[in-house]
């Protein structure tokens, strides 16, 4: 039987606290981030239902499993990711923070082709990924984690023909780019766990 999301994250927390320097982080224990993080509980079923009703979506089960353990991570950089050969650390939004962010980010639809000054045909072709629709902003993308408020991990509820609902994609600003990250929350957490395990075990 494989480890659950909660079990993998508990191990990840330990790796992060013990190896923060190598990860380029402040000491989460000394700074008090980890203590605050430990106080954060999981989201309730009624909170999930409220979120789903607000946006007319059905949250994936693995997302609910993650958020049943921790409804956000505060300042603790829980998600240590290797995306496209870039090591990036994310904090997890709470469901309430996700709602707030949705009011100004990914709150409209805009294709890459709507920005010809930034995205030439060649650039769009280079970015092409048959799992992700060619948007820069899309109402069916939901940011759930952030890297310094300039990069976001997002749940994708409207994938392209080779993608799947609930896949995880990464938006990074300046230069703006959308990058496929994982087929699901489950795979994302598994990647985080493996990345830390391989580096620090």
Tell where the protein language model's regions lie, with residue ranges.
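Long, compositionally biased interface segments
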Residues: 178-201
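Short catalytic/ligand-binding loop motif for oxyanion handling, primarily in non-cytosolic enzymes
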Residues: 71-77, 151-153, 178
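Active-site scaffold segments
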Residues: 142, 169, 189
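Short amphipathic alpha-helical interaction segments
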Residues: 136, 147, 177-181
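Catalytic-core loop-and-flanking beta/alpha module that positions acidic residues
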Residues: 144-145, 157-158, 183-184
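Residue-level marker of positions within ordered structural domains that often coincide
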Residues: 68, 149, 193
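Low-complexity, glycine/alanine/valine/leucine- and proline-rich hydrophobic stretches
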Residues: 150-164, 169-173
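A surface-exposed partner-binding patch
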Residues: 1-146
């Amino acid at each position: 039987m494989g480890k659950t999301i909660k079990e993998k994250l508990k191990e990840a927390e330990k790796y992060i606290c013990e190896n923060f320097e190598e990860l380029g982080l402040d000491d989460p224990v000394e700074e008090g981030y980890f203590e605050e993080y430990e106080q954060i509980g999981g989201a309730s079923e009624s909170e999930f239902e409220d979120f789903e009703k607000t946006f007319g979506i059905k949250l994936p089960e693995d997302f609910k499993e993650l958020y049943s353990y921790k409804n956000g991570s505060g300042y603790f950089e829980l998600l240590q990711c290797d995306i496209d050969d870039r090591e990036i650390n994310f904090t997890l939004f709470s469901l309430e923070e996700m709602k707030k962010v949705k009011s100004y980010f990914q709150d409209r639809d805009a294709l890459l082709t709507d920005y010809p000054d930034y995205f030439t045909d060649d650039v769009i072709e280079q970015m092409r990924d048959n799992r992700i629709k060619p948007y820069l902003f899309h109402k069916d993308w939901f940011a759930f984690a952030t890297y310094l408020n300039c990069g976001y991990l997002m749940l994708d509820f409207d994938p392209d023909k080779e993608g799947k609902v609930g896949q995880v994609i990464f938006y990074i600003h300046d230069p703006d780019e959308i990058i496929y990250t994982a087929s699901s929350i489950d795979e994302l957490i598994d990647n985080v766990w493996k990345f830390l395990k391989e580096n620090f075990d």
